[in-house]
Each structure stands twice: as structure tokens, then as C-alpha cells.
């Protein structure tokens, strides 16, 4: 929480969004981390910024996106998602201040003499980097990566099926850079309960085959904003249906505007 920041202003939101981008977890794995941050006293705005900025911005998916759509499109998507996350987080905190949404009653006070970097340095110094430690870390990493690889392969399979049954002309007509194509993209992203690793190849196809960069961005982002698992976890964590439903209410319109602008001007 010291790194995330205890302030309820822009600084805390920026730190939360940056933490979401840097943390290498899938869209469902990140939910548990967000819930724990809320339990540790993070504001609801920080939690929302963390969740919205994070799901497909993990380091592994960034490399995959660069391979699929190129470096500059990937960087553009990351920056735009952070902007949406920061705006949503600020609005959430403002609504809490006005009494529209309930605030976080959890609060954990850190000792006055607590310094993160000195404590982290002490912990690293006491860690024994032996051969068994390195082997155990690699083994655990390979074991845990199965979940990510499974969803990536599932996404590739879905993209392959789309390519097999939809010609480029049909795909471009249905999911092209039009308002109808954008609406259909958001509808499919809302219905599909696919992890971020699985949605990435499909989003890349929307950009490369349908020539609709906004639709690709919307597919990645609305899969987060309208994900019913995320909405339910927010409800269980905050004990508020209002907070849970304000997630799509405040993020989806931003995503649609950005996606439309990308389709028109990109």
C-alpha cells in the first residue's frame, strides 16, 4: 500500500494505474489482487484504475500484441487504456466524496518508521539464491504459466475459426470501422467470457483483417468493463451493487468514444 499511495487524489490514481500495467496477471487473476488492495485500504477509485489498466497490459501480452499488431499500435492501446483507467478512477473517488457511492471502510495504518525500499532490500538480502531456489522458481513459473498458455491457445483457436468461416470481406463488413461494426464488437465482447489472453488474437484480427483499430481496442476494453465475473467480485468485495454496476456505466462510454475516434481518424 505504501507504493500504491494512501492519497485519494490524482497521485494515488496514477500509482494504481501504473501498478496495473506493470503487474503481469490475466484479467481474472488480477481480480483477487484488486480485492486484496481494497481490503488493505485502497480507495475504490484506485481499485478501479488498477483493474481497468491491468488485464491485457501484462508484459507477456504486450509482447504478443507487438508481434500481432506492431509496436506503435500496442503502445497506443496501452496509453489509451491508462487514460480511461485514470479518468474512471478519479470519477469514482469524486462520487464517493459526494456520497453517491459508499467509501472504503477498510484502513490499515503503516508504522511511521516503515520504509518500503529498506524493508524490501532487507528481504532480498535474507533470500538465499541457491540452485534449488532458482530451480523451484523456474518450475513454479512453468507450472503457473499453463493457465495463461491455455487461454492464448483458446484465443488462437477462436481466431482460426473466424478466419475459416468468415471471408475477409464478410469479416470486414460485420466488424468493420462503422458504428454498426463497433456495436457488434462490443456485443460479442460482452457476451464472451474469455480471459484477456484469449481475446488478444481476436482483437488483433479486428485491426489487421477488418481494418478497424477502434473495434480491436473496444474488444479488449469492453471485455474488461462488462465482464460479469469482475462485476460480481466487485460486488462481493465492496458489498455494493451500485459500485459494481458503475464500472461499466463509467468505462464503456469512454471506450466507445475512443474506439470511434480511432476508427475515424486512424
Can you name each region flagged by the protein language model?
Residues 1-22, 168-174:
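Membrane-interfacial helix-loop-helix
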Amino acid at each position: 500500500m505504501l507504493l500504491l499511495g494512501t492519497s485519494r487524489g490524482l497521485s494515488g490514481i496514477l500509482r494504481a494505474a501504473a501498478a496495473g500495467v506493470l503487474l503481469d496477471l490475466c484479467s481474472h487473476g488480477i481480480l483477487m489482487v484488486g480485492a486484496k488492495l481494497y481490503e488493505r485500504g485502497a480507495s475504490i477509485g484506485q481499485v478501479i484504475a488498477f483493474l481497468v489498466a491491468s488485464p491485457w497490459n501484462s508484459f507477456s501480452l504486450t509482447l504478443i500484441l507487438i508481434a500481432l499488431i506492431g509496436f506503435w499500435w500496442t503502445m497506443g492501446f496501452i496509453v489509451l487504456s491508462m487514460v480511461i483507467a485514470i479518468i474512471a478512477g478519479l470519477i469514482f473517488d469524486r462520487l464517493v466524496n459526494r456520497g453517491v457511492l459508499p467509501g472504503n471502510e477498510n484502513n490499515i495504518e503503516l508504522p511511521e518508521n516503515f520504509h518500503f525500499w529498506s524493508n524490501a532490500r532487507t528481504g532480498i538480502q535474507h533470500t538465499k539464491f541457491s540452485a534449488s531456489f532458482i530451480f523451484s522458481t523456474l518450475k513454479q513459473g512453468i507450472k503457473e504459466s499453463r493457465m495463461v498458455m491455455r487461454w492464448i491457445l483458446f484465443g488462437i483457436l477462436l481466431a482460426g475459426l473466424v478466419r475459416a468461416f468468415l471471408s475477409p470481406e464478410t469479416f470486414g463488413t460485420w466488424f468493420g470501422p462503422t458504428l454498426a461494426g463497433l456495436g457488434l464488437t462490443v456485443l460479442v465482447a460482452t457476451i464472451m467470457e474469455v480471459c484477456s489472453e484469449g481475446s488478444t488474437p481476436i482483437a488483433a484480427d479486428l485491426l489487421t483483417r477488418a481494418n478497424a483499430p477502434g473495434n480491436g481496442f473496444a474488444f479488449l476494453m469492453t471485455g474488461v468493463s462488462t465482464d460479469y465475473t469482475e462485476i460480481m467480485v466487485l460486488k462481493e468485495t465492496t458489498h455494493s451493487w451500485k459500485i459494481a454496476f458503475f464500472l461499466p456505466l463509467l468505462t464503456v462510454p469512454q471506450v466507445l468514444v475512443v474506439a470511434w475516434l480511432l476508427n475515424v481518424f486512424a
